[in-house]
Regions:
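Extreme N-terminal segment that seeds HTH/winged-HTH DNA-binding domains in transcriptional regulators
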Residues: 1-66, 70-73, 77-82, 87, ...
């Protein structure tokens, strides 16, 4: 449970500074992935931390569930996060 709280606080502190530009030529899922990628790079989402759940990403950034899932999948494909079925997605360690 501590992991969820840790990443939730990070999301709340970061969401005040960024948002999704729905008029941009960059697809929303790529914008959201960039936001999460920056949170990982800056340490706001530390190795082992839980990536905010899809429902939380939807609510905070005003995106569709599919958009949030594609953003997390992109980070998984890049090797930045790993998903454990039934547990969620976590920032990869090392």
């Amino acid at each position: 449970m501590a992991r969820v709280r840790e990443s939730t606080f990070a999301l709340v502190s970061y969401v005040d500074r960024v948002s999704i530009d729905h008029d941009s030529a960059v697809p929303p899922y790529r914008q959201l992935a960039a936001i999460l990628r920056e949170m990982i790079a800056s340490g706001e989402l530390a190795p082992g931390a839980t990536v905010p759940p899809i429902k939380r990403l939807r609510a905070e950034y005003g995106v569709a569930e599919t958009t949030a899932r594609k953003a997390v999948a992109l980070l998984r494909d890049e090797g930045l996060v790993e998903t454990v079925n039934g547990w969620g997605s976590f920032v990869r360690k090392g």
